[in-house]
UniProtKB/Swiss-Prot annotation:
Protein role: The glycine cleavage system catalyzes the degradation of glycine. The H protein shuttles the methylamine group of glycine from the P protein to the T protein.
Cofactor(s) this protein cannot do without: (R)-lipoate
Record's subunit section: The glycine cleavage system is composed of four proteins: P, T, L and H.
Modified-residue entries (N6-lipoyllysine), positions: 60
Taxonomic lineage from the root: Bacteria, Pseudomonadati, Pseudomonadota, Alphaproteobacteria, Hyphomicrobiales
Name of the protein: Glycine cleavage system H protein
Domain of life from the UniProt record: Bacteria
InterPro entries: 2-oxoA_DH_lipoyl-BS, Biotin_lipoyl, GCV_H, GCV_H/Fam206, GCV_H_sub, Single_hybrid_motif
Annotated family: Belongs to the GcvH family.
């Protein structure tokens, strides 16, 4: 079963076992506008919670995407390098950024469920 959680920095995590798939929320992409470039983390990179992991650039701004948990990057979404605009059309689906092996599941405790995230962005 997949559990989806959200950060206050507008990232989502789809959690399956000890692996989280990470991307930015639809709210975040709507604030950014048309996405033109994405820099993804390197495979095998060790990330600490709240560390800048990726960069998303739009016609409006460049923003960091932060690691929502401590862990190792297992996979990146190479389709985003070729087609960064996927973030605008499917931010919470095909446009995931990276998968991370969760080092400490207790770090998930500070994240929001969908209802809390909707209240956060209202």
């Amino acid at each position: 079963m997949t559990t989806t959680l959200y950060t206050s920095d507008h990232e989502w995590l789809a959690i399956e076992g000890d692996v989280a798939t990470v991307g930015i929320t639809d709210y975040a992409q709507s604030q950014l506008g048309d996405v033109v470039f994405i820099e993804l983390p390197k495979l095998g990179r060790a990330l600490k919670k709240a560390e800048a992991a990726a960069v998303v650039e739009s016609v409006k701004a460049a923003s960091d995407v932060y690691a929502p948990v401590t862990g190792e990057v297992l996979e990146t979404n190479d389709a985003l390098a070729a087609e960064p605009a996927l973030v605008n059309s499917d931010a919470q689906g095909k446009a995931w950024f990276f998968k991370i092996k969760i080092a400490d599941k207790s770090e998930l405790g500070g994240l929001m469920d969908e209802a809390a995230y909707k209240a956060h962005t209202a």
